[in-house]
A protein has these predicted regions:
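An acidic-aromatic substrate-binding cleft motif
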Residues: 1
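Extended, loop-rich substrate-binding clefts of extracytoplasmic carbohydrate-active enzymes
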Residues: 8-93
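Generic recognition of long tandem-repeat/solenoid scaffolds
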Residues: 65-70, 136-140, 173
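Short, hydrophobic/aromatic-enriched beta-strand segments in well-ordered soluble domains
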Residues: 67-71, 115, 153-154, 177
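Solvent-exposed beta-strand/loop surfaces of large extracellular or lumenal domains
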Residues: 75-79, 123-136
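Acidic (Asp/Glu-rich), glycine- and aromatic
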Residues: 84, 95-130
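A recognition module on extended beta-rich or small alphabeta surfaces enriched in W/G with H and D/E
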Residues: 131-162
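Beta-strand-rich recognition/accessory modules
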Residues: 153-177
Length: 177
């Protein structure tokens, strides 16, 4: 709605789920993977990281904000551990956020993993899911919320993958890590 950056002010005030004339971010992640949280599928189960443990602010300007998040190694079954460093780029005026992840594995040469999109009714993300795993995308259009509007979340990868779903209802687009 506005042509000036609002993210810093929203997060500083801790009030970004309500519209005060500049729009809002009413997407609630809760304990789910949200939009883009990584899942590793190994030993017949999905394994996810905890919250990030370190952050590094790389750039903050009128056009782009960039930061990196580091996640502690997490166990992924059969003696495999994975750690992640994720770079997040937010461009002013864009409806998309860029995530670039680097993974370190121990205990295996590779595992199946990738970003997820929470479509569970338990997290109020019970929308209309569309996918094209061969083209590398999935999207969820959620029903309108009174006083807030609608939200659409999507994942777009530079390559195709295969779909997998975890026990909580999050759908993942998997590749090889």
């Amino acid at each position: 709605r506005v042509r000036h950056p609002v993210i810093n002010a929203w997060y500083k005030s801790r009030n970004y789920h309500d519209d005060h004339g500049e729009g809002m971010d009413f997407y609630k992640v809760g304990t789910g993977r949200g939009c883009g949280g990584i899942g590793v599928f190994n030993a017949g189960a999905c394994f996810t990281s905890g919250n990030w443990v370190t952050q590094n602010h790389l750039a903050s300007g009128p056009v782009r904000t960039v930061f990196e998040l580091t996640y502690a190694p997490w166990a992924c079954g059969n003696g495999v551990t994975v750690s992640e460093t994720r770079r997040v780029s937010l461009d002013a005026g864009s409806h998309l956020t860029r995530f670039e992840s680097r993974f370190t594995l121990a205990g295996a040469a590779s595992v199946a993993g990738g970003p997820g999109l929470d479509i569970s009714a338990g997290h109020l993300h019970n929308g209309l899911l569309a996918t094209d795993p061969e083209q590398g995308w999935l999207a969820n259009y959620e029903p309108a919320q009174t006083g807030k509007g609608s939200i659409c979340t999507a994942l777009v990868l530079p390559h195709g993958g295969t779909l997998a779903t975890d026990a909580q209802g999050c759908v993942y687009l998997l590749g090889t890590l």
